[in-house]
């Protein structure tokens, strides 16, 4: 079932997000519809490939494509240059040329790395996103950000490179472990908190249905998240302005991930912590009422996500924040929520004061 298509309007780089339930076996037809030819390298991981590679392979072969698998180890800890080289090795071994393309079958790590491989292999070949986690469906598969982590920071190496299409099948969420599923809900909260108050209301009212993985509620939540992000990306593809709002919760969230070596928290969990802290900072500066801050905290708690920063010395937090890609000469660009459904961007130069508000003192 195809529920709807959402257009990401970027002139000649525009593409559609196809949303549905049980539509994974349409991938071959979709690739033909967007004009792709040649060999398809399916980049996946050891968790997702056993579940969905055969469906993708059969669909692609029915559509007349040669298909080769490139299967990687699973986990954020593998989002690095060594694993990226494994993708290049697979592409070279399969003799992929510029007329070939990549299918990114998996979560955000696979999408980011496969997209970066597509952007850089032979100076660029097409790719299609097939996100299989809630987090990647509502965030990383939309907007063209690709890349890998560096030991000193998250996503420090990468490029903007748009896919030819995105295919989202919410039925793939049936096999997602509970913790991974909840992590994706954390990223969904972001869209309501700073960009759509009505969507935030929907999430509050439908939290139980979402937790039960109700298909209709999920399609609504995922499609609305994608539509909100698509609109922001269309306005600001390369994060020169308004797109920075999508980093709400990510500043401290990325610091948490860096300090814990990307092993203690899933991305959506770290973002949930970051959003709660951002709401506290927003309340401190008078941008957000206590009632709205408490609504954000309550929804995140109701969705089974963490809210408190892990304990590390303030100096370590400052060091992690100083490597944030949103740092400029005039300070750290911090996204605050203005009530619920709106935002403001602030340049914060006193990281010590910011951490004090969050309960991290010297």
UniProtKB/Swiss-Prot annotation:
One GO molecular function term? 3-dehydroquinate synthase activity
Q: Which domain of life is it from?
A: Bacteria
Please report the name of this protein according to its UniProt entry.
Answer: 3-dehydroquinate synthase
> Species lineage, top-down?
Bacteria, Pseudomonadati, Thermodesulfobacteriota, Desulfuromonadia, Geobacterales
Q: Name one Pfam family in it.
A: DHQ_synthase
Which reaction does this chain catalyze?
7-phospho-2-dehydro-3-deoxy-D-arabino-heptonate = 3-dehydroquinate + phosphate
Q: Give the main localization category.
A: cytoplasm
- EC number(s) per UniProt? 4.2.3.4
**Compartments it resides in:** Cytoplasm
What positions does the entry give for Zn(2+) binding? Answer: 187, 250, 267
Methyltransferase among the record's keywords? no
